[in-house]
Amino acid sequence: MIGWSAVSRSLRLTASIASVSLLFAGIGCAPRAGSLSGAVTPARFPVTDIPRGHQRIVFRWEYVDQALAAKGEGIARVASPDSVRLDFYLDGGLGGGYAIVVGDSISTPGGDQVRRYLPPVALLWAVMGRLAVPATPDTVAKVDGDVLRADIGRNPVWRVTFVADHLTRLERIVSGRRLEWVSRTGSDVRYQNERSSRSLTLKITSTDEAPPFDPEIWRR
């Protein structure tokens, strides 16, 4: 007779195999990243630190995936050197949510159920124009006119693009395929997850200096 422990182990193994299969299926659907273009150059990146002080950024947002579509207004409260609170309000007063990013950590009121809709921390910081990927000995940079591109790390590779000293794109590449990315063009910011067809777009409407924020906004 097979005991419950054996059944449990079997179920866990089956679930693990299914998860790995889905992961590789998702990676296979993502487009190939290709190689860097341009001439090899020293990997010296422009400064992307958050400006000293506090900022209040107002934006319109829209979220779309295979099962859900939502849009509304949003506010980002940014504090130097590495803190931001993002509040999202649904159109029609139907509710909302928030995410707090401090350094390399994210907290949300809904835990993992909400966090799965958000980009990884490095890509969230790219939304704000900040490069938060540590440089490694594997970094390769190339320049083409006023465009600087670099691959940082190994599997995953973070591919960053600067145009005239501004961070305009950050991609996460796994096994040679571009799984997700953030692009910044003027006041438009877009996050795209290629595996799940998930996207979050922001249209920035205003950016203003602000007085110090209430410390309570950084707590859950």
Predicted region positions:
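N-terminal beta-strand/beta-hairpin edge segment
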Residues: 60-65, 70-106
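Gly/Pro-enriched, hydrophobic low-complexity segments
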Residues: 141-220
